[in-house]
From Swiss-Prot:
Protein family per UniProt: Belongs to the RimP family.
GO biological processes: ribosomal small subunit assembly; translation
Functional note: Required for maturation of 30S ribosomal subunits.
InterPro entries, per database record: Ribosome_maturation_RimP (IPR003728), RimP_C (IPR028998), RimP_C_sf (IPR036847), RimP_N (IPR028989), RimP_N_sf (IPR035956)
Cellular compartment(s): Cytoplasm
One annotated Gene Ontology cellular component of this protein: cytosol
Ranges for region Disordered: 177-255
Organism: Methylorubrum populi (strain ATCC BAA-705 / NCIMB 13946 / BJ001) (Methylobacterium populi)
Identification of the protein by name: Ribosome maturation factor RimP
Principal place of residence: cytoplasm
Keywords (A to Z) from UniProt: Cytoplasm, Ribosome biogenesis
Chain intervals with Basic and acidic residues compositional bias: 216-230
Gene: rimP
Organism lineage: Bacteria, Pseudomonadati, Pseudomonadota, Alphaproteobacteria, Hyphomicrobiales
Length: 255
């Protein structure tokens, strides 16, 4: 069974890495797991923190719990150094794969994997995942349409993992619904045979409580706070919860 403290196979860089270092411990202390931290230019600057329960689920209340816990910490540490939107979200159906348990849970489904270190001159792979090795060192992937004479299944070294995420397919959507994950959002295609999501289905959400303001600037001459107010971006119309469709369209895809 996956544990909250299971280490990730990937890490962020730059500002995202500083945010991850600050929030990972508090998130684990709440019984959740940090998945990824992403910084984007949406609405000026958006800090997106993906989190989940060890079983892979995450609902509105859980997102709000995480947001309330880490917001004061981020305000104190100020890793961004400017105004930004804090967005807490679940990983989504086409989720990133960042732990060995993620690969175990989604064995048999299509994924895109990019290695940080080339393997036989190649870094990017797309195929059906197998079950990781017992020691968690490698994960097999079945490659479609390989050239004659080349192996159709190879073992990818997880120590060299750069990025990985599931590919959004009808089979994946059906299985996500069966496991109690969120239904697809507006703009996502679903096979009609998959059926509609139950009314009590936990929605795939983002929780955006409010824009975060930068710390007041100090007057170098007087060593006093500047009287000039610092403006933060206005929040989106419609409240703090928005759908995930936009993120699916804007996600950096692996080829």
């Amino acid at each position: 069974m996956a544990e909250p403290t299971e280490k990730r196979l990937v890490s962020e860089t730059g500002v995202a890495a500083r945010v991850a270092q600050i929030v990972e411990g508090p998130i684990e202390g709440l019984g959740f797991r940090l998945v990824r931290v992403k910084i984007s230019n949406t609405n000026g600057c958006t800090v997106q923190i993906m989190a989940e329960r060890p079983d892979g689920t995450m609902g509105v209340d859980e997102c709000e719990t995480v947001s309330r816990a880490i917001s004061p910490i981020l305000d104190l540490e100020d890793p961004v150094g400017g105004a930004y939107y804090l967005e807490i979200s679940s990983p989504g159906i086409d989720r990133p794969l960042v732990r060995v348990s993620d690969f175990e849970r989604w064995a048999g489904y299509e994924a895109k994997v990019e290695l940080a270190v080339p393997m036989d001159g190649r870094k990017r792979f797309r195929g059906i995942l197998g079950v990781p090795s017992a020691d968690g060192a490698t994960v097999p992937i079945d490659l479609p349409d390989v050239k004659p004479g080349l192996p159709s299944r190879i073992d990818l070294p997880l120590r060299d993992l750069g990025e990985a995420h599931l590919v959004l397919t009808d089979d994946l959507i059906r299985e996500s619904l069966r496991r109690g994950s969120a239904p697809p959002q507006d703009g996502e295609d679903v096979d009609e045979e998959a059926g509609e999501a139950p009314e009590d289905e936990v929605p795939q959400v983002r929780f955006i409580p409010q824009p975060k303001r930068p710390k007041p600037k100090m007057d170098k001459k007087s060593d006093k706070k500047s009287d000039k107010p610092v403006k933060a971006k206005k929040p989106k119309p419609g409240g703090g919860i928005v759908t995930k469709a936009a993120r699916l369209k804007n996600r950096d895809t692996l080829h």
